[in-house]
Swiss-Prot record:
Annotated GO CC locations: cytoplasm
Reaction equation(s) it catalyzes: tRNA(Asn) + L-asparagine + ATP = L-asparaginyl-tRNA(Asn) + AMP + diphosphate + H(+)
A UniProt-annotated Pfam family: tRNA-synt_2
Highest taxon above the source species: Bacteria
Gene label: asnS
Name recorded for this polypeptide: Asparagine--tRNA ligase
Chief subcellular location: cytoplasm
């Protein structure tokens, strides 16, 4: 007797006539007048549940089977047979069923068979993986994650685990969560009356990281090609569909690489990841295409087969100013492009993914390489039809004198970045990288447009339950 996942049965890995045991949870139960019950049982291995056919001759039919409701957990053993009904190739003729857990008071079970709004499900984050939509999101998220690791492994990258606790602000934005063990009711003070962080756990002011990039650069400048993939944190008080306080980032860094090299890597990575989802998770994509966004599959297929367009920021501004479209936010050189501008470029002008390069230095971070014009930096954003910016990257400033000047311009302390400056003092090299917000990627692939629904336990302003 073999333990079988529902997915393995549907893939034909167990011959018709073989005996298998399937373990999972009841989605629905239907009883026929002929004394047969039909259970739809899922185990999370694929989108569709398997149908178990249970005759009333089972020893516990009256005591257990007829009491089964949505959410009950069961272990079914039986024979794999070809399904006479439409919708699935195989079902299970059950010869034994063990109920491992009933649902207390089925009438109040929050995940009953009726459809719930996705907003309501956010309040039940511990139970929402049991729904079709969140289960499908979880499988797609896993597929994308595995594909990204596979891609970088095949490309010869080394995965580096960067710290979550840091004293550096990569973005220079200041929107960071403080990490402290000080007694909030009795804070130690300096002679000037400021909080004395010398008495804190790390002996200095410390924060949750906003990016693993700076740390990854140190390893790229020794191991050539590295990437990080982990959680990052922003104390940005934004209650929008696009913002989380805790989210995951994919951040590759490559030594001896230019901005164009980074753009090429980004295109290659995205196409690899999307191809993996199209190949491995079509059952879930069909659900999203039918219930969430009817363009999901077509959009991914078009993305994979598209050549990326490239345009300088300065030229992009001219395109937007002369397109004849009225935008909510006016366009002029020196502004950061808004989502509406990004989407116009990708969806209406280029009708393809587009890399916008060479942004004004005043709207970009201190570590981005200053171009020869003295006004722009070697930065890029990858814009995707349907969502806008999906990746942000840059060639890093490898010249110590220029880096120091940028730190001074932005009122950042050389002392705080002494170790980052050392990379420019000891065998400096041109190097480039980018950051991909992983939840934004999952949102793009699934069509689920609220970022809080594509991460298991969303963290946002006034939201830290579970």
């Amino acid at each position: 007797m073999s333990i079988a996942s529902v997915a393995s049965v549907f893939k034909g890995e167990h011959a018709v006539g073989s005996q298998v045991t399937v373990r999972g949870w009841v989605r629905t139960r239907r009883d026929s007048k002929a004394g047969i019950s039909f259970l739809a049982v899922y185990d999370g291995s694929c989108f569709d549940p398997i149908q178990g056919v249970l005759p009333n001759s089972l020893a516990n039919y009256n005591d257990d089977v007829l009491k089964l409701t949505a959410g009950c957990s069961v272990v079914m053993t039986g024979e794999v047979v070809a399904s006479p009904g439409a919708g699935q190739a195989f079902e299970l003729q059950v010869t034994e069923i063990v109920v491992t857990g009933f649902v207390d008071d089925p009438d109040t079970y929050p995940m009953s068979a009726k459809r719930h709004s996705i907003e309501h499900l956010r309040e039940l984050a511990h139970l929402r993986p049991r729904t079709n939509i969140i289960g499908a999101v979880a499988r797609v998220r896993n597929c994308l994650s595995q594909a990204i690791h596979r891609f970088y492994h095949q490309e010869g990258f080394i995965w580096v685990s960067t710290p979550l606790i840091t004293a550096s602000d990569c973005e220079g934005a200041g929107e960071m969560f403080r990490v402290s063990t000080l007694d909030m009711e009795n804070l130690p003070r300096t002679a000037e009356g400021k909080v004395d962080y010398d008495k804190d756990f790390f002996g200095k002011e410390s924060f949750l990281t906003v990016s693993g990039q700076l740390n990854a650069e140190t390893y790229a400048c020794a191991l050539s090609k590295v990437y990080t993939f982990g959680p990052t944190f922003r104390a940005e008080n934004s209650n929008t569909t696009r913002h989380l306080a805790e989210f995951w980032m994919v951040e590759p860094e490559v030594a001896f690489a230019t901005l164009d090299d980074a753009a090429e890597l980004a295109e290659k990575m995205l196409k690899f990841a999307f191809s993996a989802v199209l190949e491995e998770r079509m059952d879930d994509l069909n659900f999203f295409n039918e219930r969430v966004d009817k363009t999901v599959i077509e959009r991914l297929q078009a993305f994979v087969s598209s050549d990326f367009a490239q345009v300088d920021y300065t030229d992009a501004v001219e395109i937007l100013k002369n397109c004849g479209k009225k935008f909510e936010f006016a366009v002029e050189w020196g502004i950061d492009l808004q989502s509406e501008h990004e989407r116009y470029l990708a969806e209406e002008h280029f009708k393809a993914p587009v890399v916008v390069k060479n942004y004004p230095k005043d709207i970009k971070a201190f570590y981005m390489r200053l171009n020869d014009d003295g006004k722009t930096v070697a930065a890029m954003d990858v814009l995707a039809p349907g969502i806008g910016e999906i990746i942000g990257g840059a060639q890093r400033e490898e010249r110590l004198d220029v880096l120091d000047a940028r730190l001074a311009e932005m009122d950042l302390s050389q002392e705080d970045y002494w170790w980052y400056r050392d990379l420019r003092r000891y065998g400096t090299v041109p190097h480039s990288g980018f950051g991909l917000g992983f939840e934004r990627l999952v949102s793009y692939v699934t069509g689920v447009n609220n970022i809080r629904d594509v991460i298991p336990f969303p963290r946002a302003p006034r939201s830290a339950s579970f």
